[in-house]
Amino acid sequence: QRQMCIRDSFYIVSLSTKSIIYKGMLSSLQLRNYYPDLTNSYFTSGLALVHSRFSTNTFPTWGLAQPFRLLAHNGEINTIRGNRGWMEARESVLSTPDLGDIKEIRPIIQPGMSDSASLDNVLEFLVMSGLSLPHAMAMLVPESFNEKNPISEDLKSFYEYHSILMEPWDGPAALLFSDGRFAGGMLDRNG
């Protein structure tokens, strides 16, 4: 993918066997006409996520059109500069038996992408490394907790432990995610 995308003229939407991702510079009402398989009565799904907002802080391109491979995002990632920098800094020490030689897939965050696409890159890396999608999302985007919004000690320990491994990706942001097996939605601590 890295070699094909260098020319900026090719984007792999997904190679998943569990989900189909449709993209188009069109409204939600136009989807059925553009993708006729959506009107086929034999074509069914247990879940669907839709993102129909146009880009506001980046020039629209296929690579930046949402939804991404695992994520649809509405909002801003205000910590994006630090998130990208820390992810790049830790790439040299990352390892996982599930992905083989990490050097072959670096950089994990593709350059020139939006904040949403960068978050999706890291989410995809964590899931392909063996974490479940809900685990990876909770690690990247921890929920807010305080005296007015208490959480269990186990969950608090989960967030404290993961804060050592990964800094939070904070917005304000609303996020939808799916890997074809799980689907979920959440707000970040500022959403």
Residue ranges and their predicted role:
Residues F10-T17, G63, P134-V141, S152-E153, ...:
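Short coil/turn segments at secondary-structure boundaries
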Residues D37-T61:
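Active-site-adjacent "gating/activation" loops or surface patches in catalytic cores
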Residues R2-I6:
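Short, small-residue-biased leader/transition segments that mark boundaries at the very start
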Residues Y22-M25, Q30-Y34, N57-W62, Q66, ...:
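Short helix/loop capping segments that flank catalytic or ligand/cofactor-binding pockets
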Residues A48, P60-I77, R81, E167-N190:
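Conserved catalytic micro-motifs used in adenylation/nucleotidyl-transfer and phosphoryl/amide-
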